Amino acid sequence: MSNGGGIACDIENAIRMNADCMAVQTFIGAPGESRSLELLARTADAGTRYGIPTLGVVAVGKQMERTEKFFQLATRVLAENGANIVKSYYCEGFERVAAACPVPIVIAGGKKLPELEALEMAYRAINEGAHGVDMGRNIFQSDSPEGMAAAIGKVVHEGYTAKQAYEVYEEIKNSK
């Protein structure tokens, strides 16, 4: 597993910790690209030997454009360098990004959004080809993290619309 600067946790430690997946942050089109792709390939090779999948994470710097073209290229490069799953960002044209990615793709939650907006983004992403979402602050900074986690689960696993999921969120939030 990589923190972008090097391997933070090698395969032996991942096995010892009973990891379900390893993650490597990559920097496509930015300083550190070659090194991060080398780390991804090495981590994916080790993971393949031991049956642990590797998540390739598309890092986006503040100066980089979050365009469909960039994400199509970046996600494909990660898959071609061994990622079994790719984590990227939702963008206009995401359906084409997901279609061009030869491995399952999940979206990052990004910056904190109002709950309904985060659910709408998750709903659109799933309907446009994402296999899941990897949200942090949109859950743990919510007024009801439990409600938001449940609502996201409904969108991803049960096909709820954003509005239906928001009702789940509100119900759990108001029951506390």
Where are each of the predicted segments found?
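Alpha/beta enzyme core
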Residues: 2-107, 112-135, 154, 160-168
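Histidine/acidic-residue-rich catalytic or RNA/ligand-binding cores of hydrolases
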Residues: 117-119, 143-152
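A short, acidic, flexible beta-alpha connecting loop/helix-capping segment that sits on the rim
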Residues: 137-141, 170-171
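Substrate-binding cleft of secreted/luminal carbohydrate-active enzymes
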Residues: 130, 140-145
